[in-house]
Amino acid sequence: MAALASAQPGDQFHWDGKTLTTLHGPQWRLLLVGAGDIARYIAPMAMALGFEVIVCDPREEYAASWNVPGTRLLTTMPDDTVTALAPDIRTAIIVLAHDPKLDDMALLEALPSQAFFVGALGSRRTNAQRRKRLLEHFGFTEALVARLRGPVGLPIGSRTPPEIAVSILAELTQERIRHTTQSSTHPLQECGLLADDLERGAVRVAD
């Protein structure tokens, strides 16, 4: 027997021994913290790649000038935004605000989350200082800080906002492909169904 129900952020494939829950619909989300020029170039390209794009910026001057069709603009604080978004394994978060307070607020919630990609704009020096803050002031572990991709973007020598956006999306796409490939086991395996469940006929799987 099959039934449809509304999914919630954070829902995943799940098997409880009797019922298999699968997800259908939009699978990839991108949260951009900071509504500046680079975000304006990232957003339309990310949507073309199949991402739902959410932009967060509590600064009035940036929020007021955001006009990229198809995106969702939030003016809540970054930490609250990430928490409400409930990032899952199909969520990417990139901080672009150029404001340590806003960027750090987002990272404090993003790094411990299930997001498959967490990136931060800035120079190597800026990101080194950011990692130091996370370790020394916020008590993050080395493993959590190692999840941060910063400077975000593949090293293609980008300088202008469009070039930086391309480099960021290239790294994001690369990681999504790698993530998808590594998760290419059958969804039943991802949600904890053991091999012997299949062997004894507990569930019939159609390829």
Model-predicted regions and their roles:
Residues 123-124, 142-169, 173:
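Active-site capping/gating segments
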Residues 45, 105-110:
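A short acidic, amphipathic alpha-helical/loop segment
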Residues 1-58, 62-74, 88-91, 126, ...:
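Segments forming oxygen-rich coordination pockets for charged ligands
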Residues 56, 92-98, 108-134:
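ADP-ribose/adenylate-binding Rossmann-like module
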Residues 73, 114-121, 142-146:
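Short hydrophobic/aromatic-enriched beta-strand-loop microsegments
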Residues 100-104:
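Beta-loop-alpha module in the N-terminal Rossmann-like domain of NAD(P)-dependent dehydrogenases
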Residues 79-89:
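Short amphipathic alpha-helix with an adjacent loop that forms part of the alpha/beta core around
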